[in-house]
Amino acid sequence: MATEAQPAKQAKLLIVEDDVMIRVVLADMLCELGYTVAAEAASIDEALEATRKTDFDLAILDADLEGRSVSPVADALVARDIRFVFITGYGDHGLPAYRDRPTLRKPFQIDALKRTLQERLGTG
């Protein structure tokens, strides 16, 4: 049985996604790629709490959580100098204020996720 190569450092990730099915699939993909899911959040409040209480290396942010912009979470991550990636089903960019940040358009394949994470974590 072939095993996926492990990231140089087993990075810990925060998943911020309001759709439970997408969250589950994303967590499975991350585990398959050798990453650790440090925490999951389904709302802005849960995500902000996770940014304060959880140790992680990178966050994956759904740009739209229950009709609300994920901007407060992105702002908190910038303040703590934590890297993040947007995922969205709406357009090619996560948020206008953060258009320079990587964005994966849903649905995305595991190879695109792997490449994006390696680039952001400097392990590619």
Question: For the regions a protein language model found, what residue spans apply to each?
Answer:
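Two-component/phosphorelay signaling modules centered on CheY-like receiver
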Residues: 20-39
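Non-catalytic signal-transmission and effector/linker regions of two-component phosphorelay proteins
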Residues: 1-12, 109-124
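Conserved acidic carboxylate
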Residues: 17
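A Lys-centered signature of the CheY-like receiver
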Residues: 106
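Short amphipathic alpha-helix used as the core "switch/output" element in two-component signaling
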Residues: 68-82
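Active-site residues of response regulator receiver
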Residues: 62
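Hydrophobic/aromatic residues positioned on beta-strands within the core alpha/beta folds
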Residues: 87-88
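Acidic, metal-coordinating helix/loop segments flanking the phosphotransfer/catalytic sites
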Residues: 40-58
